[in-house]
């Protein structure tokens, strides 16, 4: 489940609370498109409370939106107590150098929010 979080006009805020469904992905894409209506580039804040997985179809939906819009994303903050995100972030840095991605622990949540709004 994805919960939308209001952070700032140019920041898409997401909280992940379990498995991400296609419905969640459509909700996230709609929120992203709305942010992009009023900003050329946006940042993304993702707080992972619990990661319950994502289906291949849902992942494909995400990629179909994200890939053509890569230059519209400036940075991404990932807040998670899990360390498994760090290797993915390093891979993402190599594949998508135009998007700065940083991992933060839950104790660093305020730092993540400050950074993503800069």
What are these regions (language model features)?
Residues 1-118:
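Amphipathic, Lys/Arg-enriched alpha-helical "gate/interface" segment within cytosolic domains
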């Amino acid at each position: 489940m994805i919960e939308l979080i209001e952070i700032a006009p140019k920041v898409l805020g997401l909280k992940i609370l379990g498995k991400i469904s296609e419905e969640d992905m459509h909700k996230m894409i709609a929120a992203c498109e709305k942010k992009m209506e009023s900003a050329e580039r946006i940042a993304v804040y993702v707080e992972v409370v619990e990661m319950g997985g994502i289906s291949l179809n849902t992942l494909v939906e995400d990629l179909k939106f994200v890939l053509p819009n890569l230059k519209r994303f400036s940075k991404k903050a990932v807040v998670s107590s899990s360390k498994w995100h760090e290797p993915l972030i390093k891979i993402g840095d190599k594949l998508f150098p135009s998007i700065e991605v940083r991992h933060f622990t839950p104790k660093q949540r305020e730092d993540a929010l400050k950074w993503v709004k800069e």
